[in-house]
Amino acid sequence: MAQSVVVLEKDPGVARSLAGGLHPHFSVHLTGSREELHESVLRDRPEAVVLNIEYWRLTDVESLHHDFPKLPIVCTHRIPDEEMWMAALEAGAADVCPSDDVGNVLTSVLRSTAMSRTAAA
């Protein structure tokens, strides 16, 4: 089975862009709600989650991290700043990237999944 990533993104254009950038490396499952994300994580056991904190709350990151502590969470936002980055990290995110910088998101997911596998070994 191919490694998978679940993406929670409300904007269809950004979702397609992220899926296109992640697809060469991962099987990508797009979700549009917190409930669908949670179900997908339980069902598919992805290597990482990409979640846009512009539309979803940091408490969603905290809850996801609490429920799945070994699952890397990469957050995105149109215009992330240092304060938001720090708050997301404190909530359990592995990183925060601009949502339109697909290369940065891919690098962060690859790095986070590699670190997660190393920690599990």
What label would you give each PLM region?
Residues 2-13, 18, 49:
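Conserved acidic segment of CheY-like receiver
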Residues 11-32, 36:
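Two-component/phosphorelay signaling modules centered on CheY-like receiver
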Residues 32-48, 56:
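Acidic, metal-coordinating helix/loop segments flanking the phosphotransfer/catalytic sites
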Residues 36-40, 59-60, 84, 105:
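Short acidic active-site motifs
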Residues 49, 73, 96-97:
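Two-component signal transduction core modules
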Residues 58-70:
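Short amphipathic alpha-helix used as the core "switch/output" element in two-component signaling
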Residues 77-96:
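Alpha4 helix (beta4-alpha4-beta5 surface) of REC/receiver domains from two-component response regulators
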Residues 101, 105-121:
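Receiver (REC) domain switch/output surface
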